[in-house]
């Protein structure tokens, strides 16, 4: 559901529930927030290099050049499930159910998709196999 229409805030930090977040991420959250507001951008996705992922099966979502995200045939960075977004990027969405990939692709096409690299280990509860490896 598109909750942006019913909210009053301009900027949002969102966290996916299937990533194992811990206190080591606090520094990265703070750095992301500082970068986001200092550079007056409208989106910032936390990404990690594939070799920092507990689940080695991830193929990669993006590549990162400076702080710009883009997609190629082979991608070396994984989206962690954390992003800071400004409500303005949702203005053209006229439906209640949509995929964030639609917005990311649009921003990427305009070369306005930004990323921030985390140096933390990325643990995503992909499936029961990964869950069992953690225990």
What are these regions (language model features)?
Residues 12-13, 20-33, 37, 50-54, ...:
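Catalytic-core segments of class I nucleotidyltransferases/pyrophosphorylases
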Residues 3, 60, 130-132:
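Short low-complexity, flexible loop/linker segments enriched in glycine and/or proline
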Residues 43-61:
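Short beta-strand-to-loop element that shapes/binds the nucleotide-sugar donor at the catalytic cleft/hinge
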Residues 9, 40-41:
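Short, high-confidence coil segments that cap the C-terminus of an alpha-helix
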């Amino acid at each position: 559901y598109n909750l942006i229409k019913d909210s009053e805030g301009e900027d949002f930090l969102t966290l996916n529930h299937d990533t194992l977040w811990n206190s080591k991420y606090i520094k990265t959250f703070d750095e992301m927030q500082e970068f986001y507001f200092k550079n007056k951008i409208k989106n910032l996705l936390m990404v990690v290099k594939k070799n920092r992922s507990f689940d080695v099966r991830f193929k990669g979502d993006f590549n990162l050049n400076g702080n710009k995200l883009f997609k190629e045939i082979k991608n070396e960075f994984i989206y962690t499930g954390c992003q800071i977004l400004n409500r303005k990027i949702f203005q053209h969405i006229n439906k209640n159910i949509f995929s964030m990939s639609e917005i990311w692709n649009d921003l990427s096409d305009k070369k306005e998709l930004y990323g921030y690299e985390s140096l933390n280990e990325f643990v995503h509860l992909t499936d029961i196999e990964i869950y069992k490896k953690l225990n």
